[in-house]
């Protein structure tokens, strides 16, 4: 498993639907890039100049929405994860 460093989080992306409501199958080029996912790991938090650490606002298991082109995709054990900074998370889905 990947362990994020600092203020980074690891997200398992939620894939977009492969077919439309009317039953049309979408090709990879027609699908929009997903910007939702579930947090699978959280770093220790951002380190400030005075040496204190800011506790992350998100936790493992949170469903989140993040900026469209944020982060770096990493493939591990046949799974694709997204490593991004906590600041790139826009909202937690309740």
From Swiss-Prot:
It comes from the Bacteria. The keyword Chaperone applies. Induction: By heat shock. It is found in: Cytoplasm. Transmembrane segments: none annotated. InterPro entries: Chaperonin_GroES, Chaperonin_GroES_sf, Chaprnonin_Cpn10_CS, GroES-like_sf. PANTHER family: 10 KDA HEAT SHOCK PROTEIN, CO-CHAPERONIN GROES. Belongs to the GroES chaperonin family. Together with the chaperonin GroEL, plays an essential role in assisting protein folding. The GroEL-GroES system forms a nano-cage that allows encapsulation of the non-native substrate proteins and provides a physical environment optimized to promote and accelerate protein folding. GroES binds to the apical surface of the GroEL ring, thereby capping the opening of the GroEL channel. This is Co-chaperonin GroES. It comes from Staphylococcus aureus.
């Amino acid at each position: 498993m990947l362990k994020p460093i600092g203020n980074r989080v690891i997200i398992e992306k939620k894939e977009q639907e492969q077919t439309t409501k009317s039953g049309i199958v979408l090709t990879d080029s027609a699908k929009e890039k997903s910007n939702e996912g579930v947090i699978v790991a959280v770093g220790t938090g951002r380190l400030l100049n005075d040496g204190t650490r800011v506790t992350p606002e998100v936790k493992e298991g949170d469903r989140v929405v993040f900026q469209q082109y944020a982060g770096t995709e990493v493939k591990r054990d046949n799974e694709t994860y997204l490593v991004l900074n906590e600041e790139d998370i826009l909202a937690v889905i309740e």
